[in-house]
């Protein structure tokens, strides 16, 4: 998912970045400012509702959620819900740091931008619409410039996801897979090849990440890119200390994800050691990051990948599926619902 987002590029248009000429009439601006938000809210709400309604195993998972509110282990579900706010709070802080070169925004505004990004991401291929949801909270002249900056944040997250996923694959290769435990369609030979390929690309991404300034200057020398350099110039200003800080936030956010999964796996009695489950979660995140998906099939992919991986450790298929569904509901659907509400108050243009 993150890799597709990194390759995604939004071309200049009136929605993201306007020329300085005031070519929109006042009535048109009023329409965009006061009607687009509510229209987007209705569309997003209906789309999210249809996605939830069409998901398999949802009624059973909902019953499991209701039962989980009671009992000695109910704190785990509450903790997972609380960690959702921590998770997106870390992402909001990253966004605030990333865009400060083009516009200073408050943490709360960054938080709303993240939630709105999730609302649109849930309705677009591989979540690429997330960028649009975020940049509408910036001034119209800064939106396209912020797209390049947001890619830096996605790159930091994919570096963490790939690095931890590779370690997880090594653990899977050496401690889990044997004659009776194997992943369907993936033998040790292909697994070794996958690890080498992923290691190569992780190194490439790390080099790109910490050489953004040099790389941006190099790209600016390409003739047909020269007239667009204004949109990527801010990438030159990132110091390695800032990049390290963003990478650290991505790593902490990643750990929050892992803890959420571990808590729910324990809640639903998926019996295995914490180390085994933890590294398997890392492999799962890697799969979700590199396999393209469409919104309506995202939960299906999560569920199938979870069954394949955690099925190597436990026969509790129902607990594995419940975990995948509830994580999707808490981390994806709830923020998307909040974001669809926030978008009502968005003003796309100055009056």
Please state what every model-predicted region is.
Residues 120-122, 282-301:
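Transmembrane alpha-helix interface/packing and boundary motifs in multi-pass membrane proteins
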Residues 96-105, 130-144:
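Transmembrane-helix boundary and interhelical linker motifs in polytopic inner-membrane proteins
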Residues 120-124, 148-170, 325-337:
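Membrane-embedded alpha-helical segments of transport systems
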Residues 136-142, 303-319:
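Interfacial segments of multi-pass membrane proteins
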Residues 1-113, 171-291, 330-351:
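Predominantly cytoplasmic-facing regulatory/coupling regions of multi-pass membrane proteins
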Residues 108-109, 141-154, 316-326:
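Membrane-interface alpha-helices at helix entry/exit sites of multi-pass transporters
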Residues 111-140:
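Extended non-transmembrane interhelical loops and adjacent amphipathic helices
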């Amino acid at each position: 998912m993150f890799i597709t987002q990194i390759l995604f590029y939004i071309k200049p248009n009136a929605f993201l970045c306007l020329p300085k000429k005031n070519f929109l009439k006042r009535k048109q601006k009023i329409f965009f400012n006061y009607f687009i938000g509510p229209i987007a809210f209705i569309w997003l709400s209906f789309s999210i509702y249809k996605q939830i309604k069409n998901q398999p195993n949802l009624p059973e998972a909902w019953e499991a959620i209701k039962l989980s509110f009671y009992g000695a282990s109910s704190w785990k579900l509450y903790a997972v819900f609380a960690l959702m706010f921590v998770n997106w709070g870390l992402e909001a802080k990253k966004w605030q740091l990333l865009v400060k070169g083009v516009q200073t925004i408050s943490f709360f505004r960054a938080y709303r931008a993240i939630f709105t990004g999730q609302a649109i991401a849930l309705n677009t291929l591989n979540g690429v619409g997330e960028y649009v949801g975020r940049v509408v909270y910036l001034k119209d002249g800064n939106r396209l410039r912020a797209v390049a900056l947001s890619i830096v944040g996605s790159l930091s997250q994919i570096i963490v996801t790939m690095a931890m996923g590779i370690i997880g694959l090594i653990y899977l290769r050496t401690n889990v897979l044997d004659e009776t435990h194997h992943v369907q369609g993936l033998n040790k030979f292909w697994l070794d090849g996958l690890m080498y390929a992923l290691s190569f690309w992780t190194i490439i991404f790390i080099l790109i990440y910490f050489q953004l300034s040099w790389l941006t200057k190099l790209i600016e020398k390409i003739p047909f890119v020269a007239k667009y350099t204004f949109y990527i110039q801010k990438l030159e200003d990132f110091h390695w200390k800032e990049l390290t800080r963003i990478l650290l936030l991505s790593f902490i956010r990643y750990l929050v994800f892992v803890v959420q999964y571990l808590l729910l796996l324990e809640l639903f009695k998926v019996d295995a050691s914490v180390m085994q489950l933890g590294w398997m979660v890392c492999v799962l995140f890697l799969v979700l990051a590199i396999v393209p998906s469409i919104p309506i099939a995202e939960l299906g992919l999560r569920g199938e990948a979870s069954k394949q991986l955690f099925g190597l450790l436990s026969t509790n298929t129902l607990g594995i599926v419940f975990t995948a569904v509830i994580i999707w509901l808490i981390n994806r659907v709830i923020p998307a619902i909040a974001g669809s509400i926030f978008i009502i108050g968005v003003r796309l243009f100055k009056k």
